[in-house]
């Protein structure tokens, strides 16, 4: 259900409810991302040594994200909200292409395809929710347009199967990592803005 039908005047969804929905969504996205990565890893990455190559190769690396809760605590909530928005926007493009390209993987199970489609849709919903939250917390500010461009499509289409599978592996690895970060930042923001840091 849409949070507020467009054009509705008396739509009173509290900021707390908006955060509840965002946290539930981000948790679901992280759960799906982990499941999809594990399934892909089990099916395609065994014995290929991908994990040793997959260090720091995420397209969102240019967005400086706090490494742990302590670092995140130091960041002003407006900056943290904008950071979440930036990471989500950075995934629009890769998720769209992931849905298309995953269908071309040899014997790709339906479960992986379903998760890719579901994550792409839920990411859009979370992005809309975050824009609403930012509109409430910082009225008149839709957040900055900062996001990380993704240029990984050619690597998902490589003829060499090993290289192509590694590109998928890396993308799914990054998706799991970033969805985990977003999940943590949103929980922290909810605690700070809704519960006055008493959690």
Curated annotation (Swiss-Prot):
Record-linked Pfam families: Hormone_1
Main localization, broad class: secreted
GO annotations of cellular component type: extracellular space
Locations listed in the record: Secreted
Disulfide bonds, paired cysteine numbers: 4-11, 58-174, 191-199
GO biological process assignments: positive regulation of cell population proliferation; positive regulation of receptor signaling pathway via JAK-STAT; response to nutrient levels
Keywords: Disulfide bond, Hormone, Secreted
A Gene Ontology molecular function term of the record: hormone activity
Family of the protein in this entry: Belongs to the somatotropin/prolactin family.
Name the UniProt record assigns to this protein: Prolactin-2
């Amino acid at each position: 259900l849409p949070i507020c039908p467009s054009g509705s005047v008396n739509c009173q969804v509290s900021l707390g409810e908006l955060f509840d929905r965002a946290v539930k969504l981000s948790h679901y996205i992280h759960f799906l991302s982990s499941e999809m990565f594990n399934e892909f890893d089990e099916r395609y990455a065994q014995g290929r040594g991908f994990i040793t190559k997959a260090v720091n190769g995420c397209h969102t690396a240019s967005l400086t994200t706090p490494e742990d809760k302590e670092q995140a605590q130091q960041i002003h909530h407006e900056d943290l909200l904008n950071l979440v928005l930036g990471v989500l926007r950075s995934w629009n493009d890769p998720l769209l292409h992931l849905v298309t390209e995953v269908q071309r993987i040899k014997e790709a199970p339906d479960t992986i395809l379903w998760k890719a489609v579901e994550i792409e849709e839920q990411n859009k919903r979370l992005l809309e929710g975050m824009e609403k939250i930012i509109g409430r917390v910082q009225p008149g500010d839709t957040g900055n347009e900062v996001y990380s461009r993704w240029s990984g499509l050619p690597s998902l289409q490589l003829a060499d199967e090993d290289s192509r599978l590694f590109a998928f592996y890396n993308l799914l690895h990054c998706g799991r990592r970033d969805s985990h970060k977003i999940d943590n930042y949103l929980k922290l923001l909810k605690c700070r803005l809704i519960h006055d840091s008493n959690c």
